[in-house]
A protein has these predicted regions:
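Extended ligand-binding clefts on enzyme/binding-domain cores
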Residues: 145-146, 153-268, 275-286, 298-327, ...
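The tetratricopeptide repeat
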Residues: 57-60, 100-103, 147, 151-154
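CBM-like carbohydrate-recognition segments
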Residues: 11, 22-55, 62-83, 87-101, ...
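Bacterial Sec-dependent N-terminal signal peptides
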Residues: 1-22
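Acidic-glycine-rich active-site phosphate/pyrophosphate-binding loop
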Residues: 29-34, 75-78, 122, 126-133, ...
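Short acidic (Asp/Glu) patches
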Residues: 11, 136-138, 207-208
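Asp-box/WD-like beta-propeller blade repeats and closely related beta-sheet repeat scaffolds
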Residues: 116-155
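Surface loop/turn signatures of beta-propeller and other carbohydrate-active proteins
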Residues: 33, 86-87, 137-141, 191, ...
Length: 362
């Protein structure tokens, strides 16, 4: 009798959990949680509006506005642009400082006001015309993998918008410099920067299990950035196949590293050393994989269940107020320094981008 009762209780719990997670995929519920998280984050700012962190956040806000058509969200976008005078951050040569320009360009496409992109045009023109101004260091312009989210979409969006192919060509040049430096073809993952590239000397960095260090959010930046490139490049653009193949190769690797709870760990190849899912990297993976399914680059039968598992887990990391938790703070490598109370604006941005694609599932 006790066994029957226990089985019945477990069955009820399973049904309840399944019903709850099923609600996460109802379009109106997706819109509701997107607005809830967006509004919480807008009320709790942490950085300068044109900081790189907000480059990711406002990309998510724009995606949330496209999804919900919320007037409040659109006004938040305009308020942000007006507060910065539509300017990038200070370092013209640094990919981080033009991340916000992705959203300026998106808004310009609607509003057609030149002042919304003029500073972006000026900054990108300077970037293309001058070497990286770090004396004593020989370095490429995009020398860390996070840059592949920050810079490429701005160059490609701008090139498409103003009909200047030079921006697209330079993006391809800078992207492939970073790819050649940091992409591990065997693992199909990016090292965060040159310090994490294995050289077989005493300066190598390894995880506790002997595996190489590949950071979840770093690779999330890359995959999210690839989506934002591919959304812009014409189907017949000569170098598009390179980006499509890289996207597919990374996607296949990434799904093999998903953990049982639906999230990825801060360290992709040593999950046991980093208990607890990390939401910013997982959010960008969810966004990228969902976009790949929606655009027929990834097999639906293989990838859709992965995305659904991730979206369910991401929703479970949103508290009642709308705060997206379990986000690793700003850094450059896997850490264990986050909890349910840890949040950052880019974590919310990743969540919003993911929702904007999950809602398109049929």
């Amino acid at each position: 009798m006790k066994k029957v009762v226990l089985v019945s209780i477990l069955s009820c719990v399973t049904i309840a959990v399944t019903a709850q997670s099923g609600k996460y995929f109802e379009p109106e519920n997706i819109k509701t949680v997107m607005q809830k998280t967006a509004k919480w984050q807008l009320k709790n700012p942490k950085h300068e509006p044109n900081d790189w962190t907000n480059g990711a956040f406002y990309a998510g806000i724009y995606a949330a506005w496209e999804t919900t058509q919320s007037e409040d969200l659109y006004m938040a976008l305009l308020d942000m642009g007006n507060s910065t005078q539509w300017k990038p951050a200070e370092l013209w040569y640094h990919a981080d400082d033009i991340a916000i320009c992705q959203t300026y360009i998106d808004i310009f496409r609607k509003e057609k006001k030149q002042e919304m992109i003029q500073a972006t045009v000026n900054t990108v023109s300077k970037l293309l015309a001058n070497p990286y101004p770090v004396r004593g260091i020989e370095v490429i312009k995009w020398w860390w993998c996070d840059a592949l989210f920050m810079g490429p979409a701005t160059l490609v969006k701008l090139g498409i918008t103003v009909k200047n192919d030079e921006y697209l060509k330079k993006n391809d040049e800078y992207f492939k410099e970073c790819y050649d430096l940091l992409y591990n073809r065997e693992e199909r993952l990016f090292a965060r920067d040159l310090g994490y590239v294995i050289k077989n000397d005493d300066k190598d960095r390894w995880e506790a299990n002997g595996k190489r260090i590949f950071w979840s959010r770093g690779n999330g930046w890359v995959m999210g950035g690839l989506v934002r490139i591919l959304k812009e490049l014409p189907k017949d653009y000569p170098v598009r196949p390179f980006y499509e193949q890289l996207f597919k190769d990374m996607a296949a690797k990434i799904i093999s590293l998903q953990q049982a709870d639906g999230l990825w760990r801060a360290s992709l190849l040593d999950p046991d050393s980093y208990p607890g899912g990390e939401v910013s990297g997982s959010g960008f993976f969810c966004y990228a994989l969902a976009w790949g399914v929606n655009n027929n680059l990834l097999d639906e039968a293989t990838y859709k269940p992965v995305v659904k598992k991730t979206w369910t887990a991401l929703n479970d990391c949103v508290n009642d107020e709308g705060r997206v938790g379990w986000v690793q703070p700003i850094g450059a490598d896997p850490r264990k320094n986050f909890t349910a109370d840890s949040w950052e604006v880019y974590g919310t941005g990743a969540f919003l981008l993911a929702g904007s694609e999950v809602i398109k599932f049929k």
